[in-house]
């Protein structure tokens, strides 16, 4: 029987290998060469290439706290009143004007975007204190309608290299806008993006303020997870993205959050096989974070990585992801950014001190069944071994965490309109459950979200 089982297992492995190698993704080496085209050389003019576009997003979230978790609101005066329910409903609209680049060796362009938010649910108890979902006054009342200049920048371009100055959207592993609310965040500063080579790009930037998702003003940078109120005046970053093979992409970035930490990031994604038969995608993300400067957050020495495998057969994708934090503090990143390019960053980030986590997820793409744009997904993730008892600092409230654990599961569906006047309109519904042990920071709750984003073109 043992020989039969061994033979069957060997046959299964051989069959799987054959399927993966059927019509495989090219593994060919990609030599680095200067780009054959110049983006600036194709510029048509400031007004000739101008665009006026926008989106309007209806963002609804309904949370129910469970176990020992609760929200609070000000029923009267300054005394907080606990409640188990939190509801936020906001309409966020963006109108974005982008000019074309002027012609010549050096081209110039500008971008201006007006952000507007309307609180559709203004009940003080429903909002349960506001936070980063609905903008509120100091007394807890909703700000019914507010606007701000979300983007305002000028660009200068030579060939395929662009320098941007002003308020802008940035998306890198060490500083990235976060767009999971009615409106996204943005940053004030300078950024350089160079695509002079066919398989090698370079980015660098320096930013001194963030425009939060649910605030009208600009603020300094602060930590996402520190319990102290410390601010950083600047984030500097640089990085490269390199594609040495047709099937392999790599990234390396470094950043300095002034007087907080130095952070280094490395990643690769490798593609194998053919998704019509069986494709395999492997993704590694690694962050190294070390305290720096005045060490406003105290000692930090953190190594965090995630490794994920996604097998895809036509409409079906199955993902297995492992993530681990090696450090006595959280894996941390700047507040109002999405600089956590890790596989198990879900409703919870699964980034507690010394935490290990495992996720399994499934996605069904209905395009294979004649309904392009429709997708379903389901996942479950578990984190364990959270231990902050050896933490030597005071910035992170982790010393009571000793063997903490938690789990999360979610289901979701999304649909994106493929053509017609509502092309690119997207609707997404998700239901997520999170349960935590006593001192795990995220608590226990259920959340339902319904987000509808309608895109429109004016000019």
PLM region descriptions:
Residues 58, 163-177, 202-204, 238, ...:
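Transmembrane beta-strand segments that form the barrel wall of outer-membrane beta-barrel proteins
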Residues 21-167, 364, 412-418, 426-459:
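Beta-barrel outer-membrane channel/assembly domains of diderm bacteria
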Residues 98-131, 138-219, 240-247, 319-330:
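Outer membrane beta-barrel
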Residues 322-323, 327-404, 408-411, 416-418:
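C-terminal structural cap/anchor segments
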Residues 52, 105-108, 160-164, 199-203, ...:
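Repeated loop/turn-to-beta-strand initiation elements of outer-membrane beta-barrel proteins
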Residues 203-226, 235, 277-357, 437-443:
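Outer-membrane beta-barrel translocator/channel fold
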């Amino acid at each position: 029987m043992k020989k039969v089982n061994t033979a069957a297992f060997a046959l299964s492995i051989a069959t799987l290998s054959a399927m993966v190698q059927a019509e495989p993704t090219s593994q060919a080496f990609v030599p680095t060469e200067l780009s054959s085209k110049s983006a600036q050389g194709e510029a048509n003019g400031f007004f000739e290439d101008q665009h006026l576009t926008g989106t309007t997003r209806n963002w609804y979230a309904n949370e129910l706290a469970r176990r020992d978790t609760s929200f609070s609101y000000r029923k009267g005066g300054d005394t907080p009143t606990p409640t188990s329910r939190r509801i936020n409903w906001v309409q966020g609209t963006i109108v974005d004007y982008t000019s074309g680049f002027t012609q010549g060796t050096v081209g110039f362009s500008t971008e201006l975007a007006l952000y507007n938010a309307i609180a559709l649910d203004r009940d003080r108890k429903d909002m349960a204190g506001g936070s980063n979902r609905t903008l509120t006054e100091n007394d807890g009342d909703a700000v019914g309608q507010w606007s701000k200049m979300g983007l305002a920048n000028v660009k200068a371009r030579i060939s395929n290299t662009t320098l941007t100055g002003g308020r802008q959207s940035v998306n890198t592993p060490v500083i990235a806008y976060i767009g999971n609310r009615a409106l996204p965040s943005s940053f004030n500063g300078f950024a350089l993006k160079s695509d002079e080579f066919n398989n090698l790009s370079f980015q660098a930037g320096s930013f001194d303020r963030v425009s939060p998702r649910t605030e009208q003003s600009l603020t300094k940078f602060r930590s996402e997870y520190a319990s102290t109120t410390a601010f950083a005046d600047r984030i500097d970053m640089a990085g490269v993205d390199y594609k040495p093979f047709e099937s392999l992409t790599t990234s390396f970035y470094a950043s300095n959050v002034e007087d907080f930490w130095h952070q280094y990031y490395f990643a690769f994604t490798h593609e194998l096989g053919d998704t019509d038969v069986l494709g395999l995608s492997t993704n590694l993300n690694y962050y190294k974070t070390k305290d720096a400067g005045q060490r406003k957050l105290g000692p930090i020495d953190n190594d965090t990585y995630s490794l994920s495998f996604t097998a895809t057969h036509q409409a079906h994708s199955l993902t297995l992801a492992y993530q681990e934090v090696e450090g006595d503090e959280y894996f941390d990143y700047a507040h109002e950014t999405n600089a956590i390019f890790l596989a198990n960053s879900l409703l919870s980030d699964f980034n507690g001190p010394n935490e290990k986590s495992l996720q399994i997820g499934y996605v069904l793409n209905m395009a294979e069944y004649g309904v392009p744009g429709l997708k379903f997904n389901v996942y479950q993730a578990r984190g364990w071994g959270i231990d902050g008892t050896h933490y030597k600092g005071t910035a992170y409230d982790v010393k009571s965490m000793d063997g903490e654990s938690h789990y999360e599961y979610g289901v979701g569906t999304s649909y994106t309109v493929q053509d017609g006047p509502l092309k690119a309109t997207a609707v997404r519904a998700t239901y997520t459950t999170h349960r935590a042990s006593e001192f795990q920071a995220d608590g226990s709750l259920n959340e339902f979200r319904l987000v509808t984003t309608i895109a429109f073109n004016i000019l």
